[in-house]
Regions:
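Long, leucine- and charge-enriched amphipathic alpha-helices
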Residues: 195-229
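Structural signal for interior beta-strand "rungs" in well-ordered beta-sheet cores
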Residues: 3-196
Length: 229
């Protein structure tokens, strides 16, 4: 009576579920999963085998924790062959995960989301990503495999981050930023490729003036080629 399990939910073998946890209808909990105390899994959440959730974790409907990482090799026969993803996902205490978000299991080791981090809807975290403590990741952002995000970072909506990078603690990435290199700590970046916010703002302002500037250059060119006309 210390936990609640909704209708049509399947819980695999050797799972450990903490007191006060509420698992909604139609969830699928794989073998060997650990779920801490006072967690809330809404309807149709999938937690795949051996993944670990801390206490007071909330996961919104349709999220998938521990899906296979995206790993393939080209075989000798000219066809892609899947690489086994044998790691897990580990969510710290007080993590929130939004609806239809997917967090891939590590190829080896762990994909980690640190305590207190808040993840919005429709987020993709690739295999072996490490997100620090008390970060915020807003809707439709994606982080490719093996990237590390420091504590207290803020990632706004529709940000794309390449793999094997380091995003500094307390950094801020503006909406639609494309990140292809490391980001320092305590900075605000924006645009593509990601640049310091002031630089990116100047670039955007200059870009808006480009059509008029092109017309002016064409007019000057005509005057030089046909003076007096």
């Amino acid at each position: 009576d210390k936990i609640h399990v909704g209708a049509y939910t399947c819980i695999g073998a050797h799972c450990v579920i903490g007191d006060g946890t509420d698992i909604g209808n139609g969830c699928d909990i794989g073998d060997g999963v650990t779920i801490g105390e006072n967690c809330r899994l809404h309807a149709h959440v999938i937690i795949r085998e051996r993944c670990k959730l801390g206490s007071r974790v909330t996961i919104q409907p349709g999220a998938v924790i521990g899906s296979d990482g995206f790993g393939f090799l080209m075989g000798d026969n000219g066809r892609y062959v899947g690489i086994d993803q044998v790691g897990i996902v580990e969510l710290g205490d007080d993590v929130d995960v939004g609806a239809n978000t997917t967090i891939d299991r590590a190829r080896f080791g762990r994909t980690i989301v640190g305590e207190g981090t808040k993840i919005d809807n429709l987020i993709q975290l690739g295999h072996n990503v490490v997100v620090g403590k008390h970060c915020v990741i807003v809707a439709q952002s994606g982080i490719a495999g093996s990237t590390q995000v420091g504590d207290y970072a803020t990632i706004a909506a529709q940000v794309g981050i390449s793999g094997h990078l380091k995003i500094g603690s307390k950094s801020v990435l503006g909406a639609k930023t494309g990140v292809i290199s490391d980001i320092p700590e305590n900075v605000a970046y924006w645009g593509f490729p990601a640049s310091p916010f002031k630089d990116a703002s100047r670039q955007y302002a200059a870009l808006k003036k480009l059509p008029a500037l092109i017309k002016e250059v064409h007019a000057l060119k005509r005057n030089l080629e046909s003076p007096g006309k």
